[in-house]
Amino acid sequence: MPPTANPLSTPESGDDHTATIVDDCGRPVPAHSVGRRALLAAAGAAAIAPLAFGTPAAASSPGPHAPSGKPGRRPERGHYLIKGAALVSVDPTIGNQAKADIEVCDGRIVQVGPNLKARGARVIDASKMIAMPGFVETHYHMWSTLGRNFVSTGFEYFAAKSATVAAYQPDDFYHSVLLGLVECASAGITTVNNWSHNVRGPEYADAELHAHADGLVRARYSYGHRDGQPATQPIDFADIDRVAATWFGKKPPFGGLVHLGVNLRGPGQLPTFLAEMAEVSKRKLPISVHSGQGPTTAVHAADLEKMGFLGPDFLLCHALPFDEADRQAMVRTNAPVSFSVHSELRLGTAGGFHGQLLRMLAAGVTVSLSFDASSLAPINMFESMNVAWNLGIPWVGTDTAELPPVVFRQAIEMATINGAKALGLQAVTGSITPGKRADIVLIRADDLNIAPIGDLESTVVRSATPANIDTVLIDGRIVKRNREMVSHDAGTIVRNAAAAAHAVRTRAGGVLTPTSPTPPRF
């Protein structure tokens, strides 16, 4: 929904008050190129500049499934000067700075440094904030976001998932994914890998993609199988082709934010996996695979390398049973890994996450962070970084004793640039670098749980929480400002999600049967 007040200050004027025609990013337009039409266009742009929020977010989407409810309004990409922030850039050249400015125009980071001038830009006062790149999450089953509280004592993740997989309708998928996307944006997660492993039919894929069109978050949509699908039955490549043509064809509704991938079940179903890999290779789609939280579910990287499949576009998740041969195969092929830190601790019943994390980093594997599911982890990358940092210490008397510990910078890289590398987006996002898209998070540094700040990286990893996030930009759009979502009506999203979750529980029955015949009201 639109903000109740203009979240920005007056335009940055600079010192020169000479009348000059400039483009939307404040760059002077040569006089010889300024005709009557250009003057009218510039005047029109100036007239609408204060109206930062106006286009409906629910723009036309090509799929046949029409979800119920409108999520909010789509902010325009503006011209902004983020002023005076303490900076954690994750760019090795720019580094961390005690006080820096960031110019953003038309979705792109233009320049970064102290005391910048940006004619015509609207200033965001970040003098009491830390600026950092948006987080990049690499493994999230978003269709089940509604089920975050379906679990209970004695009825945990797999039991709750098994009881509800067939109880979702397409509308439930829409509300689940939209809830997850907007929650991610609010928590500073500007990119996510939607690992869709319960595609029950074309209408379900369409519902998820409608949510992505409305969600305004950068993403990979990783199309997969139906939960419970027979091991001998491949995923629906005919529908993947339909999705590619319908949603990612000539006029995608995502504004360049979403790309298509697949998730596969791995060599555990070897004939099916080989057939699926042959189809994926024809389509040149990036791949995500669960690689095991215990010996019985292991998918070994060394075997995948021998098959000729491993590479930078092959994302392995969990990987707890991996040995040195697997790690070296990943290093040779630049294959990334996604660690869902809470899930590894809860579901990794064979143990070993602490040691695997240290060994992967020591070997030089690209390690990224993820949530797995909302019923396994909080959607909170600050906590994921903190857990990884706390676990990342060598244990005396074990085979990790001589390995280097995880440091704060590594924890931040796992949550940002490494995630971007894992999704093939390192040239687009993951650091505050001129030329990259403006996925930026501003964290209040004067809150009780953060102040007084010292080392910036320690502050981000150990003290900050989503509650401290003041402002979020995704692709140069302000989606959160003054701690409030301005791109979406969060109340409507929550109410729709609550109604959908109530319907899923009612259909599932058993221990999930709601105590009230009507959904809770918020």
Please state what every model-predicted region is:
Residues 307-309, 357-447, 463-465:
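His/Asp/Glu-enriched, well-ordered alpha-helical/loop segment
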Residues 69-74, 88-101, 347-353, 420-460:
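Acidic, glycine-enriched loop/beta-strand segments at the rims
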Residues 71-72, 203-327:
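Metal-coordinating catalytic core of metallo-dependent amide/deamination hydrolases
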Residues 437-494:
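C-terminal cap of metal-dependent C-N hydrolases
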Residues 149-217, 241-253, 498-506:
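Alpha-helical scaffold segments that flank or form the walls of functional sites
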Residues 43, 60-81, 86-132, 252:
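Histidine-rich, glycine-flanked metal-binding segment
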Residues 1-34:
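N-terminal secretory signal peptides
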Residues 146-175, 229-230, 295-313, 329-337, ...:
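Active-site gating loops and adjacent loop-to-helix segments of metal-dependent hydrolytic enzymes
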